[in-house]
A protein has these predicted regions:
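A general secondary-structure signal for short beta-strands and their flanking turns/coil
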Residues: 1-3, 38
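Short, surface-exposed ligand-recognition loops at beta-strand->loop->(often short) alpha-helix junctions
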Residues: 3-15, 47
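Acidic, low-complexity, intrinsically disordered interaction modules
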Residues: 16-51
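Conserved short beta-strand edge segments in small beta-sheet-based binding/regulatory domains
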Residues: 31-33, 59-69
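Charge-rich, low-aromatic oligomerization/scaffolding segments with amphipathic character
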Residues: 50-62
């Protein structure tokens, strides 16, 4: 099981639905928490390949979101 947590800022991310669709497309479970400046995602995947694929796509769309390797 692979777990990652990342935060988004509303000034950088205008379409949170896109992030959620990408997570669902890669069969990654997620828990979203909203806060004043943005959202926090806790994502869980059974396979490392799905997580790598999602992170690669997220970096292409939103390079300003910091993600651990």
């Amino acid at each position: 099981m692979h777990i990652t947590i990342f935060r988004t800022l509303y000034k950088h991310v205008i379409d949170h639905d896109l992030i959620e669709r990408m997570l669902k497309r890669n069969n990654i479970a997620f828990e979203k928490t909203g806060y004043d400046a943005g959202s926090r995602y806790k994502i869980i995947s059974d396979t490392e390949e799905a997580m790598v694929s999602f992170k690669k796509r997220l970096r292409e769309v939103y390079p300003q979101i910091p993600l651990s390797a």
